[in-house]
Amino acid sequence: MSVLVNKESKIIVQGFTGSEGTFHATQMIAYGTNVVGGVTPGKGGQTHLEKPVFNTVAEAVDQVDADTSIIFLPPAFAADAIMESVEAGIKVIITITEGIPVNDMTKAFQYVKAKGATLIGPNCPGVITPEEAKVGIMPGFVFKKGKVGIVSKSGTLTYEASDQVVSQGLGISTAIGIGGDPIIGTTTKDAVELFMNDPETECIVMIGEIGGQLEADAAKWIKASGNKKPVVGFIAGETAPKGRTMGHAGAIVGGSEDTAEAKKRIMRECGIHVVDSPAQIGAKVAEVLS
């Protein structure tokens, strides 16, 4: 078992023939990901990267049984692409696009929830189940197969955490980059819950940042559900000034509970093994697993 994606997943790329879609689809295919085709309206019937191109997601679902989609489209079109995927019956939608208008994203989010699909992102690096499926923009070589699940708001810190876990002789079950926008489809708590229910995941690394309540909500849920698996946590943005975004649109300290200090306090109170530097993640994981 893994979560969200594996070697059986049938993946399509929305924005397949564009420069971003082409570049990352090439990397995904080279990794061994089961990319079954892509969607670019007006180019249906062509082939690209030796895969079929479809005009619509519905055609892709009908003809190649696609069940997972990754979206590489400009912000103005991405929310519609999410809703098109859901309407066509896609179960897991991974949205890389940054800067989708909040109003568009609110509609798409409500649509996804109403239909029971799973949305990862937007503004995320994607999801990787090592040695099975890389559905995103992450460097695949950093990830080795194992029993540690990673959930992170940050792309680069996902790669850093994986590199450290692997350097300890351990590996990753699945890594989920949930995204750094204010409105995202899968929260920290949602992702942690997936790992808690995954028999192959024995430890969870939870990486958050200033702004919002996602990490506190996840920590309280972990405690309420009985701390079934060890969780190692890190919060980025310790030195961020109040009222300034730090890299991500959602990374902004509004109230006193949004600070790194407050989040880390809540996480510790809930039994999470919190580290103060990303450089300590790997060693802490090895420690709690021993």
PLM regions: where:
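Catalytic-core regions of core metabolic enzymes
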Residues: 1-290
